[in-house]
Regions:
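Positively charged n-region of N-terminal signal peptides that target proteins for export
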Residues: 1-5
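Bacterial N-terminal signal peptides
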Residues: 7-15
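Sec/Tat signal peptide C-region and signal peptidase I cleavage site
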Residues: 17-21
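Extracellular glycan-recognition modules
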Residues: 24-43, 64-121
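Extracellular glycan-recognition surfaces and repeat-rich motifs
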Residues: 37-59
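Short, aromatic/His-centered strand-loop micro-motif at the edge of beta-sheets
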Residues: 123-144
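Short tryptophan-centered beta-strand motifs in secreted/extracellular beta-sheet-rich domains
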Residues: 142-151, 155
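Short, solvent-exposed beta-strand-to-loop segments that form ligand-recognition rims
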Residues: 158-161
Length: 161
């Protein structure tokens, strides 16, 4: 799944909701990879000398393709949900994730898109994945708000389950 993202224009706001805390990143400010509470850092992997920050839904967004530029982070405690804003410039050449989460045992769940723009829920264990259609298609060059709600075992797209 090429580092959980591919052909993504940007992620404006990534939220990790734990039982008692919420971590948010806006990409604005002096250190755009530092969470709003100043305690968590996104790890940025890129072959570019300077990461490309672009205009997002609100504020800045990181332009990434999931292959040459992507991000990850480690969280403490249980995570109940992930959310983020994404916009595709093109569809990936293979199924790729907008965002996902993996536990210490190697079990993962991710919201993905295929090469035709169909959204999928990807579930895997140690690199072996299976996908279930979310029965919706993503338009290119339009912002999409994605919420992966682990507590309620659901995915919300632009506020709709």
């Amino acid at each position: 799944m090429k580092h959980f993202a591919y052909s993504i224009l940007g992620c404006l706001l990534l939220s990790l909701n734990a039982a008692f805390a919420q971590k948010t990143w806006s990409f604005d400010g002096q250190d755009p990879l530092l969470s709003s509470d100043g305690k968590s850092l996104l790890n940025l992997y890129t072959i570019k000398e300077i990461p490309e920050f672009v205009t997002g839904v609100e504020g800045k967004a990181l332009r990434t393709d999931g292959y040459s530029t992507w991000m990850d982070t480690t969280t403490e405690g249980d995570v109940s949900s992930l959310s983020g804003w994404f916009a595709l410039e093109s569809y990936p050449t293979d199924t790729a994730a907008f965002m996902g989460i993996r536990d210490m045992a190697g079990t993962s769940v991710a919201v993905c898109v295929d090469r035709y723009g169909e959204l999928l829920l990807g579930m895997g264990q140690n690199g072996s994945y299976s996908y279930c259609s979310l029965k919706t298609k993503v338009d290119r060059f339009k912002w999409l708000h994605v919420v992966l709600d682990l507590s309620n075992e659901s995915v919300c797209l632009n506020g709709q389950r």
